């Protein structure tokens, strides 16, 4: 039964991590530089499932080391190498998450594939520095036990403590502190609300946005000396008044603007005929009626062409140079804010998933490293039974 369960775990580990590598390498949406951590982590887990777990299963089932003595030493070194690499990868991912949240603009500009690969190389070098000493310095191994050969980890106290601290306790402490810090940053960010993150509406309604683009678009809209106020909507039209209006000094040929600024109807309302198809007499009559709000199109092309859809909750201010869209939450700043909000949501979701992974990781690894370290601290009185170990 144990062999069947372990075999299923081996196959599941290989298949699942192979899918992770395949997804990152083939999907464009997953080709972000930080996902290289997942590729390297998945590779380390696949190596554990193929080179470590099968020999460990055979050793437990047979009760002795069936393979060569030299392979036992290499096997133990690879065991420490791959497991330490997997743990330090999780630590590096947590640090990457923290830097991306705390220093978003600065770190995201530096988060290049080259930089991520250098961090991954450093992770593997740390794992190698912890796993290779038993191969280089074997120390006093003592007499070999009689009977069938055994393959056991290094029992020297200095190596047990140093490898346990470097492989588990130090990375685990770093991950716990980092994710606690990320949680506090996310909590403080949620308390501030969207306005602290640059909510639309603070500075967006103060600057009009062009409605159209191209040669007929409004290039330089008139400058409003004072803020305009909306009096109210009557007969399907919104009347906008201001204390003072003046034209820009860049174009001396532009006539002086009248006191009442005509406003086009809101979305869903039909436009009146103003320029396209009007006779000179009709245009003159329209100019004489200065107190009545007029619907002036941006250009003859826009008046004769298909009706442009304007966003809901926005108004179009008609000027002598064209149309100016006074939007509520519409524009580049609003789009950037929503994109930033979606990005933060993804960051929080990813951080939550990684936190679950870290929790499972601690529950799985802590019993082994705790009992392994006790053998170096008090080998006589605190020794854990071999079956439990």
UniProtKB/Swiss-Prot annotation:
What's the protein name? Answer: Alpha-2B adrenergic receptor
Q: Cite the position(s) of the site with description Implicated in catechol agonist binding.
A: 163, 167
Task: Please indicate if the UniProt record lists Nucleotidyltransferase as a keyword.
Answer: no
UniProt entry tagged with the keyword Methyltransferase: no
GO terms for MF: alpha2-adrenergic receptor activity; epinephrine binding
One Pfam family from the record: 7tm_1
Biased composition, class Basic and acidic residues, residue ranges: 234-249
Q: Which cysteines are joined by disulfide bonds?
A: 72-151
Compartments annotated for it: namely:
Cell membrane
Q: Which GO terms describe its cellular component?
A: plasma membrane
Ranges that cross the membrane? 1-25, 37-62, 73-95, 118-140, 157-180, 354-377, 387-389
**Organism of origin:** Procavia capensis habessinica
Q: Which residues lie on this side of the membrane: Extracellular?
A: 63-72, 141-156, 378-386
Q: Which domain of life is it from?
A: Eukaryota
InterPro entries the record matches: ADR_fam, ADRA2B_rcpt, GPCR_Rhodpsn, GPCR_Rhodpsn_7TM
State the Gene Ontology BP annotations.
platelet activation; regulation of smooth muscle contraction; regulation of vasoconstriction
